[in-house]
Amino acid sequence: MDIQPEKTCCFTGHRPQFFPWGSNTGDPAAAKMLRALESEILQAIADSYTTFLYGGALGVDAWAAEIVLRLRKNLPLTLIAILPFPGYNADVTENSYRQTIAASDRILCVEPVRRMAALAARDRYMIDRS
């Protein structure tokens, strides 16, 4: 499956620790942000985007991916995890995070080994394909 940039949207954003609510998506401010994120994803779909790339990070990446997975139940969407290297976030124990990665249509690793430059390479990979 080739990635068609004209039909591809990518997500990246803040990690939970940079939001006042942290990982508590039940917080009213978090719920408002998630509704806005879903609205933007729905607009992208209305604009003919069908493939969604996310960087596999906690926070905005994971929340956007979860929304796409929910919408994918009724729409022909593709979700691809673009990880910087194998084992990225292997220490994360949150079930929802692991389930999101596992439910992705594809998982790609940009670099073969862990190194700091892999994070920027992951971001560049997503930008170049969306």
Please name every model-derived segment.
Residues 1-130:
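Acidic/glycine-enriched connector segments
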